[in-house]
């Protein structure tokens, strides 16, 4: 009997994490296993963040279904996703729903799945900030609490998942699916034309990314942080390359700083090459920090916590919060080449998705 799996993505970063699972399902099909999948996106078909190159780079097809939800209010978004995803499940026989990470749309899909009596699996389970005032922390608690199967990326996540949900859920430490992509795409990565255009040399620039609304919406704080890293790097003659979008780009552009190169948002392969060959990275993205650990690139995270503490305990990541003085201090350590010794966490081996699919096939 065919096993029908529905994979839900709520935003662009989710596709990067589910892509290895989709490729593993396709390989399982080629090997004669009875397994089908559909990819459902909570957003709209014309979402500008879902450029064709993203799917080409990841070697997956675009979503089969778009729920078409597009709103800023998280409660409204949750309600719309629940309503539309429920209709989808009623019309499409599904054995397992896979959700990833901790978005409001992810939580909405998880709730509907359980109400329909369908098996629910959560990738990147057991991640916690331990700050219940954060909407995403509430999402994580709800999703993990409802899930039948919890797929964790590391030992600390596994410990949390076992402690909180072992009686109701099956917990599997499968490793980090994000790393599957890097290993899969390594041979296809090539030096982007942008680096020639900007005369950038491998190992002689810092990449800066900003995506967290908490930072971007606080103009004074964002300017302070950007100024801290750019001025420190400029003193050392090292350019800061910043692929920024929207409000963040406008704010930084208005600062008129020397030593920063504002560039367009890059495709996944080009961005991966850019970060893998940087002297260091300053980011507020957990995904970027995880990839930096795998690539052995020093990383400064503009946050006081990380969902994957292995990137700090074992990897190249250092947390500075939103503290501009500490950011200056760590940027100078980076520029002096005095970064801490680091390694790669257990099971970040590029085979996480294969483990996930085989577990689901056997359920």
Summary of predicted features, one role per range:
Residues 4-9, 15-26, 30, 54, ...:
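Active-site and donor-binding regions of nucleotide-sugar-utilizing enzymes
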Residues 99-100, 111, 122-123, 150, ...:
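A donor-sugar binding/catalytic signature common to diverse glycosyltransferases
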Residues 52-54, 190-277:
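Donor-nucleotide binding loops and adjacent catalytic segments primarily
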Residues 44-49, 68, 146-220, 320:
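A nucleotide-sugar donor-handling region in carbohydrate enzymes
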């Amino acid at each position: 009997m065919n096993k029908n799996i529905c994979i839900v993505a709520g935003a662009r970063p989710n596709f990067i994490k589910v892509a290895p699972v989709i490729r593993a399902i396709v390989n399982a099909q080629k090997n004669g296993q009875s397994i089908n999948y559909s990819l459902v996106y909570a957003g709209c078909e014309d979402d500008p963040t879902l450029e064709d190159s993203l799917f080409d780079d990841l070697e997956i097809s675009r979503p089969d279904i778009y729920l078409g939800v597009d709103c800023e209010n998280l409660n409204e978004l949750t309600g719309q996703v629940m309503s539309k995803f429920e209709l989808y499940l009623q019309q499409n026989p599904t054995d397992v729903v896979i959700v990833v990470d901790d978005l409001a749309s992810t939580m909405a899909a998880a709730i509907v799945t359980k109400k329909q009596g369908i098996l629910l699996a959560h990738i990147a389970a057991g991640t916690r900030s331990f700050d219940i005032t954060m909407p995403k922390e509430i999402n994580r608690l709800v999703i993990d609490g409802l899930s039948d199967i919890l797929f964790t990326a590391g030992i600390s996540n596994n410990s949390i998942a076992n402690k909180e949900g072992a009686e109701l859920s099956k917990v599997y430490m499968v490793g980090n699916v994000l790393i599957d992509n890097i290993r899969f795409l390594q041979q296809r990565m090539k030096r982007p034309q942008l680096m020639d255009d900007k005369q950038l040399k491998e190992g002689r620039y810092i990449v800066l990314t900003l995506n967290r609304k908490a930072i971007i919406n606080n103009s004074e704080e964002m300017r302070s942080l950007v100024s801290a890293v750019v001025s420190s790097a400029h003193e050392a003659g090292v350019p800061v390359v910043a692929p920024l979008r929207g409000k963040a780009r406008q704010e930084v552009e208005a600062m008129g700083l020397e030593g920063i190169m504002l560039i367009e948002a890059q495709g996944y392969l080009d961005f991966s090459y850019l970060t893998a060959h940087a002297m260091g990275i300053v980011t507020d993205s957990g995904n970027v920090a995880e990839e930096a650990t795998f690539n052995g690139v020093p990383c400064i995270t503009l946050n006081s916590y990380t969902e994957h503490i292995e990137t700090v305990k074992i990897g190249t990541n250092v947390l500075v919060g939103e503290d501009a003085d500490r950011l200056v201090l760590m940027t100078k350590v980076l520029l002096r080449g005095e970064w801490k010794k680091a390694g790669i966490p257990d099971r970040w081996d590029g085979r996480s998705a294969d483990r996930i699919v085989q577990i689901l096939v056997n359920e």
